[in-house]
Amino acid sequence: MISSNDLRPGVSVEIDGAPYKVIEFLHVKPGKGAAFVRTKLKNMQTGNVVEKTFRAGEMLPAATIEKVNMQYLYSEGDNFVFMDMETYEQAPLSAAQIGSAVKYLKENMEVAILRWKGQVIDVELPNTVVLEVVETDPGVRGDTATGGTKPAKLETGAEIQVPLFIKVGERVRVDTRTDTYIGRE
């Protein structure tokens, strides 16, 4: 059990039989009445975001989420095959189970698979990945003075905005949480 006073971003709780992850929280102490905690929660099964309010000190059941380190091996049709780093067991996951993480998956990449009651609910990518630019418009001389950006397609199929000086074949570092360019490799 977790007290509502201990809720922080990233903490997992179980509400109405479903796992939720705290995205935002605000502890409110009104002039009159009891204090309460206003939260924004993400359902880890469906991805829906809901706002809930709890009384200060209210006890909530903790969601027991198992984190397993796995390595992405290859894709086979609509399935993506991962290998457990400890037991070497292989597990196929569908694109629906992986969600938006699929656009950054590269062979031999290590990821964390989150399970709740034996069911895969999320794939955690590394915060940054290094990928090669396979398609982008050529930069024109003198373009960098404005600090503009242009779209670029990466080797995994993901599309991000990159600075104008980036060329096809260059390796760029990308933040997987915000889908933004960080720098050249």
Curated annotation (Swiss-Prot):
GO terms for cellular component: cytoplasm. GO terms for molecular function: translation elongation factor activity. Pathway: Protein biosynthesis; polypeptide chain elongation. Keywords: Cytoplasm, Elongation factor, Protein biosynthesis. InterPro entries: Elong-fact-P_C, NA-bd_OB-fold, Rib_uL2_dom2, Transl_elong_fac_P/YeiP, Transl_elong_KOW-like, Transl_elong_P/YeiP_cen, Transl_elong_P/YeiP_CS, Transl_elongation_fac_P. It is found in: Cytoplasm. Its main location: cytoplasm. It comes from the Bacteria. PROSITE patterns: EFP. Involved in peptide bond synthesis. Stimulates efficient translation and peptide-bond synthesis on native or reconstituted 70S ribosomes in vitro. Probably functions indirectly by altering the affinity of the ribosome for aminoacyl-tRNA, thus increasing their reactivity as acceptors for peptidyl transferase. Belongs to the elongation factor P family. NCBIfam families: efp, PRK00529.1. HAMAP family: EF_P (MF_00141). This is Elongation factor P. The gene is efp.
